[in-house]
Each structure stands twice: as structure tokens, then as C-alpha cells.
Amino acid sequence: MSDLESLKTSLLADIAAASDEVGIEAVRLAAMGKKGSVSELLKTLGSMTPEERQTRGAAINALKNEITEQLTAKKTELKDAAINARLKAETLDVSLPVRSSPAERGRIHPISQIVDEITAIFADMGFSIAEGPDIETDYYNFTALNFPEGHPAREMHDTFFLQPDANGERKVLRTHTSPVQVRTMEAQKPPIRIVIPGKTYRQDSDATHSPMFHQVEGLVIDKTANVGHLRWILEEFCKTFFEVDSVTMRFRPSFFPFTEPSFEVDIQCDRSSGPIVKFGEGKDWMEILGCGMVHPNVLRAGGLDPDEYQGFAWGMGLDRIAMLKYGMPDLRDFFNADVRWMSHYGFRPLDVPTLFGGLSV
């Protein structure tokens, strides 16, 4: 039995000397691996006589069990030691304030928020969202919308023209979102109820104008659409968007090439508090949008018979109504990517606006 005792002493010494998990694994393989010293002894059990199994066999199994227990205990000891060493090296001040999550630190840009608010309001009224290209043809941007030749909007001082293509046609950066109206009429049969948010481009830049700005407009086409429907939709929108119980609006006659009759819409407000305008109260008036009944020529350009269908449309500047609602003094701040400005005027990303909540909180 002296050989078993010697092996046991040697293996226990190796186990005790192991300083990490790699070392203890090497000892395990040397003892219990396929060709390990204990495994080789276990292979001899089959050739032993019954008497030998009772004595030497029992001693070999006892050696195996003890070595296995010692290996397991050493592994646990080394694992605990590694954890303790890491904890000792990693200092953590539990009195420090908890970091906010990325969702709390980030902010939604006011324009993105305004688009979400407006589309949520009109979606709850049964409207769908339509979009179109920023680079438009002269036809969709002007001709199909009843802009006559020589109209000021066709001049270089107001419109960004691209270089002529191989066919000599010059495309433009769209000056309004109205081309989507004609594209929708061509692609979809009435009834049509769409709201169209998007970027537009004009050569203008000051505290209240930008060469690139945002618009949203709506379009309704069916056989019975009228100004009464238009007024109701705009009143409901303004009450919800400006979060007031009632609004007083007035429709002033105006002119737009693509609508007839055309109106500019004013809303009653209180402008005595500086940049923040209070809607639904006061004695002041402020223009917020333009609208009208879709011109018969625009219906024809969209492939519709004006004797059978009629409709109305409205449009407004997203940047301007954002400035009005939230008291922002300078349009140029919208595009400066100032983190401090975003932290002040931005919105929490998990606050999704709907008709029933989350519009500005």
C-alpha cells in the first residue's frame, strides 16, 4: 500500500501548491484524466482477484474519492480568492448618484416632437401620413399646382434650382410639401385623407426664416368636402395641439394658386407675455396657417374630375408653430446642435404623444 500512500501524498501536495484555476486543472488531468495516475490504477481493478478487490481495490477507490474532494474544494477556494481579489481591486463608492439611463439623458428634437404630435392628432381623426421626394420636378412643384409661368416662386431668388439633366430639365428642391398632394391623387382613388410632414427649401435666412424648414399640410378629397368640414378639422386640431378647451378662429380671404377660395387663418391669443403666446384667451390675433378648397386645375392634374370630386387643403410651418407653442425666440437655434439648448427644449424619448396625452409634458 506504500505506493498508494506515496501517490496520495504527492497529489495532495500538487493540489495545495496550485495557485490558480489553470494550475488546479493541470493537477486534475494528471490524476483523473484519461491517462492520469489514479485512472491508471482504476484500470487494474478488472484484473484483480476478489480478495485483492476487497483490499487494494477499496484503497484505490478511497484514493479516487479523496483526490476528487480535494480538487473540488481547491477549485472553490481559488474561485472565491479570485472574486475577492477583483472586489478588492474594483472600488465602488455607493454614495455616488446613480447614472441616468441613455433614454433619460437623450432628448427628442422639438421638430421631431412637433411632427409626432401633429401626426398623432390627425391620425386619431382618421388621416394617414404621406411623403414625397425632396428633389422635385418643375411639373409637380409648380405646373401641377396651378403656378402660372412668370410666378415669382419660379424665380432664382426664391427657389433652389439644380443643374439641368441630360434632357435639359432642371429639378428643384421642393418649395413646399404640396407636390405630394398631386402624387397622392395620381396613385390613390378618393376618398383621400392625408397629412404630409416634410422638409422644404427656399432662399431665405434670418431669425424667423431658414433656407431649409419644415412644413405640414393636410388634404381631404371626396364628393362632399366643404369649408365647414375644413373649419371643424382646424378648430379641433388647434384645441388639441395648443392644449386649450376652446379657440376662436377667423378666416380671412387670401390667394394661393392651388386653392380657390383661399383663406389665411388667424387664432385669438394673448401676446402680452413676451415670446410665449397664450392661445384660447386674450384679444390679439395671430396668423397660423393657410388653407382653401383645392383648385379644379389641381384636381385635373391629379387625374380627378372636378365636377365629381372636391376637396380642401391646409398647410403650416412646423418650425414657426413650435416657436409659438414653446416660446423659442430664434429659428436658427433649431439647427445649431447645441446640447444645452436641446437639454432645455428637447423632449423625453419615451413620452409618445397621442390625442390623449404626452403632447408637451
From Swiss-Prot:
Cofactor: Mg(2+)
GO BP, sorted A to Z: phenylalanyl-tRNA aminoacylation
Keyword Metal-binding: yes
Catalytic activity: tRNA(Phe) + L-phenylalanine + ATP = L-phenylalanyl-tRNA(Phe) + AMP + diphosphate + H(+)
Binding-site residues, Mg(2+): 260
Stored SUPFAM superfamilies: Class II aaRS and biotin synthetases (SSF55681), tRNA-binding arm (SSF46589)
Subunit structure: Tetramer of two alpha and two beta subunits.
Protein family per UniProt: Belongs to the class-II aminoacyl-tRNA synthetase family. Phe-tRNA synthetase alpha subunit type 1 subfamily.
Protein name from the UniProt record: Phenylalanine--tRNA ligase alpha subunit
Organism of derivation: Allorhizobium ampelinum (strain ATCC BAA-846 / DSM 112012 / S4)
Lineage: Bacteria, Pseudomonadati, Pseudomonadota, Alphaproteobacteria, Hyphomicrobiales
